């Protein structure tokens, strides 16, 4: 057992889940099997999808979910119940993921007040879907991270809002005192799924990965006891949404760079700056696009 790892990861004799009489997807959150979750996850294989499901990546994802905690999704499972559930059901979950039979659950809608008025919608995934999204994020993020614009600060490793503010102040000190406020109103709610998936497919050719990501985009939202179909948007609340937003908005970053503008973007907040007022016409052109 890895030093500092909770006892649940200790190597113990494996059992035959197929002969246990329990369905892998059954609603039972407390696992009683002595099977080592570490052993069940397995060593993984070299393909992109197999790397996502590999032992080390899944363990890292689980630790991230447990560290971030957060509320449960529509099934009522809490983060503290996840390890026991995985020990009982991971073999079946992994099989369904590998064969394309896994279906993400709808997210639970939560509306939170915004400082300036109005509300922001969050979509809270189940903790199991949060785990899988985190595992996807960890595999896909390095593919794009080296390509993202230096002017993008939101939801990126080693970058922060404080750094974005410092960079913006640097633009002011350099004499770029005209500011254009790019309005990306309700960006997360209006993302076109086909456009987004086309951007992802530029760098990912694993059809299973693409299908799983699209499954999360279309998983639906539970609000008022009714599941609403989702044909657009990628609601905030899961680990995958921030990365997908940066992938889509990278085109905006590249267009601003092509025009020679200095700017700072943090998620859907973007503030280009210029020395002269005429840059406002560029802002209007970008808005119309």
Regions found by a protein language model. Name each.
Residues 89-92, 96-111, 115, 139, ...:
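Conserved polymerase palm-domain catalytic core
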């Amino acid at each position: 057992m890895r030093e500092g790892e909770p006892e649940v990861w200790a190597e113990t004799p494996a059992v035959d889940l197929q002969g246990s009489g329990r369905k892998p997807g059954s609603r039972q959150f407390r696992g009683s099997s002595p099977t080592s979750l570490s052993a069940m996850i397995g060593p993984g294989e070299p393909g992109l999808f197999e790397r996502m499901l590999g032992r080390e990546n899944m363990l890292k994802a689980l630790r991230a979910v447990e560290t971030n905690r957060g509320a449960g999704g529509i099934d009522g499972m809490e983060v503290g119940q996840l390890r026991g559930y995985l020990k009982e059901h991971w073999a079946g979950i992994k099989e369904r993921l590998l064969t394309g039979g896994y279906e993400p659950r709808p997210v639970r809608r939560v509306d939170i007040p915004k400082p300036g008025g109005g509300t922001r919608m969050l979509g809270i995934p189940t903790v199991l879907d949060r785990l899988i999204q985190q595992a996807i994020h960890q595999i896909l993020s390095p593919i794009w991270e080296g390509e993202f614009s230096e002017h993008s600060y939101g939801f990126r490793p080693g970058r922060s809002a404080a750094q974005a503010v410092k960079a913006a102040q640097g633009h002011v000190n350099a004499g770029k005192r005209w500011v254009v406020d790019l309005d990306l109103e309700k960006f997360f709610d209006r993302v076109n799924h086909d456009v987004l998936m086309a951007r992802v497919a530029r760098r990912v050719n694993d059809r299973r990965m693409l299908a799983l990501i699209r499954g999360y985009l279309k998983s639906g939202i539970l609000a008022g006891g009714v599941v609403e179909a989702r044909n657009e948007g990628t609601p905030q609340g899961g680990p995958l949404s921030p990365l997908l937003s940066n992938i889509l908005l990278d085109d905006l970053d590249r267009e601003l760079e092509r025009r020679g503008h200095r700017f700072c973007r943090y998620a859907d907040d973007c503030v280009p700056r210029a020395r002269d007022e005429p840059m406002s016409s560029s802002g209007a052109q970008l808005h119309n696009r």
